Regions:
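Bacterial N-terminal signal peptides that target proteins for export
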Residues: 1-11
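Bacterial N-terminal signal peptides
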Residues: 9-19
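N-proximal helix/coil linker or "cap" segments that precede and/or mark the start of modular domains
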Residues: 18-42
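A short beta-strand-turn-helix
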Residues: 42-63
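Short active-site neighborhood of thiol/selenol oxidoreductases, capturing the structured segment around
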Residues: 56-76, 98, 188
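Structural microenvironment flanking redox-active thiols in thiol-disulfide oxidoreductases
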Residues: 74-124, 134-142
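Short, internal strand/loop/helix patches
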Residues: 118-155, 159-163
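Thiol-/selenol-based redox modules, centered on thioredoxin-like
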Residues: 153-214
C-alpha cells in the first residue's frame, strides 16, 4: 500500500472509531423526552414493595419526582438538614404525590435493593408517597435525570411544570439550605394556585446517576 493510501486508511479508521465512541456515549447517557410545558412521559416502575406504580395512577394530581442516591453528599445535605423530609410531609399532606426514584444500575454507586431503600427511608425518616426502583434507567432517561437530586414537578393536567435542581445553592453545606431559593417549592406553589411557573427548567447539581450501559 502506498504512503498516501495508508494515510487515508488510517484517517478513515480514526474517524470510524470516533464515531463509534460518540454513538456509544450517546446510547448510555440519558435520552430525554420530558420537556417543560409538554405532557409528562408515561411510565411505570416497581416500588420497594413489589407493586407496579404508573404515572397514570395519579391522573389529576400534582406529582413530584425526586431522584435520589443514598451515598451522595448533595442528597445528604437535604436529608441531614431535614429539608427533604419537611417538603415531603408538607406537600403530601396537601394532596401532592411524591415519588422518590433510584435509577443507578446494579453494581453501581447509588443502586439500592428494596431492603436497602426501606432502610434509607427509615434512617432518613422520609415521607414520600412511594419509592420506585428504576435499575434499567428507563424512567430516569425519560426525564433527563443526570444528577441527584434531580426534581420534576408535574401539574394536574399531567404536564411538566418544572424540572432540574432543587434549589440555587449547588453545595453540600447544610447551612445553605436556609438561604437557598427553592425552585421546587416555587413551582409547586405556583402550580397549586393555577399560576404560571416563573422558572421551568434548571440544571440539576449533585452526583451523577450511573446508568446501565447499552
Amino acid at each position: 500500500m502506498g504512503k498516501f493510501a495508508a494515510t487515508i486508511a488510517m484517517t478513515a479508521a480514526l474517524v470510524a472509531g470516533l464515531a463509534l465512541s460518540i454513538d456509544r456515549a450517546t446510547a448510555i447517557g440519558p435520552t430525554a423526552t420530558a420537556k417543560p410545558g409538554a405532557p409528562a412521559p408515561a411510565f411505570s416502575a416497581p416500588d420497594i414493595n413489589g407493586q407496579t406504580i404508573g404515572l397514570a395512577d395519579y391522573a389529576g394530581k400534582i406529582v413530584i419526582l425526586e431522584w435520589t442516591n443514598d451515598g451522595c453528599p448533595f442528597v445528604g445535605k437535604h436529608y441531614d438538614s431535614g429539608n427533604m423530609q419537611a417538603l415531603q410531609q408538607k406537600y403530601t399532606a396537601a394532596g401532592v404525590v411524591w415519588l422518590t426514584i433510584a435509577s443507578s444500575a446494579p453494581g453501581e454507586q447509588g443502586y439500592v435493593t428494596p431492603a436497602q431503600a426501606r432502610a434509607d427511608l427509615a434512617r432518613w425518616r422520609a415521607a414520600p408517597t412511594d419509592f420506585l426502583l428504576d435499575p434499567e434507567g428507563i424512567v430516569g432517561r425519560l426525564y433527563d435525570a443526570r444528577a441527584t437530586p434531580h426534581m420534576v414537578v408535574i401539574d394536574r393536567a399531567s404536564r411538566v411544570a418544572y424540572m432540574g435542581a432543587i434549589d440555587d445553592k449547588p453545595s453540600t453545606r447544610l447551612a445553605d439550605v436556609k438561604t437557598a431559593h427553592n425552585y421546587v417549592v416555587a413551582a409547586l406553589d405556583a402550580t397549586a394556585a393555577g399560576q404560571p411557573v416563573a422558572v421551568t427548567s434548571t440544571r440539576a447539581y449533585g452526583c451523577s446517576i450511573k446508568y446501565k450501559e447499552g
